[in-house]
Design a protein with these regions (language model features):
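Second-shell loop/turn segments in exported
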Residues: 26-28, 64, 95-97
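Sec/Tat-exported extracytoplasmic proteins
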Residues: 42, 128-131
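Short amphipathic alpha-helix with an adjacent loop that forms part of the alpha/beta core around
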Residues: 39-41, 75-87
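Active-site neighborhoods of enzymes that stabilize oxyanions during catalysis
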Residues: 131-137
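Mid-length scaffold segments of soluble, non-membrane domains
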Residues: 43, 48-72, 91-94
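Short beta->alpha connector loops
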Residues: 72-75, 98
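Catalytic cysteine-centered active loop of the rhodanese-like fold, especially the PTP/DSP P-loop
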Residues: 82-127
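Flexible, polar/low-complexity N-terminal or interdomain linker segments that lie immediately upstream
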Residues: 1-48, 55-60
Length: 137
């Protein structure tokens, strides 16, 4: 019980309080896309999906054809990124609405001069729930 009170005091939210988005979309000029738009772009093959999760999460399952660039490891992917056109549409995602790695990675990609970056904020959880194409390694 003491732990519960401590948690509530420190976080300013209760254990059973309503979940909030990890990152407010209004604080960024980032274009957020819906699951429907993500699926449309996936089917048209006009975009490269970029998974911002850790490598071990990516290996457990990811959107089919997605490239893994973990947010914390972006520097190790510089050569890979140099081989992608700066105009190529990149759809960045992470685990879901409680994960903001997709937004942070998208901002870093924009800093690297990629001009067509979008965020699929529903991410892996929403994609998997719809039973859309996935791969595992």
């Amino acid at each position: 019980m003491v732990l519960g009170f401590t948690y509530t005091f420190v976080t300013k939210q209760g254990v059973f309080s309503e979940k909030k988005l990890a990152y407010s979309a209004t604080t960024s000029n980032m274009e957020m896309i819906s699951i429907e738009k993500a699926k449309e772009l996936y089917e048209s093959q006009s975009a490269l999906f970029v998974d911002a999760r850790h490598d071990f999460e990516y290996k457990m399952g990811h959107i089919r054809g997605a490239m893994n660039i973990a947010l914390k490891e972006i520097d190790t992917h510089r050569i890979q990124l140099e081989n992608i056109s700066k105009e190529k549409m990149l759809i960045v995602y992470c685990d879901g609405v409680e994960c903001n790695s997709s937004i942070e990675l998208a901002l870093k990609l924009m800093e690297l001069k990629f001009t067509n970056v979008k965020v699929f904020f529903g991410g892996w959880q929403e994609w998997k729930a719809k039973k859309y194409p996935i791969d595992k390694e």
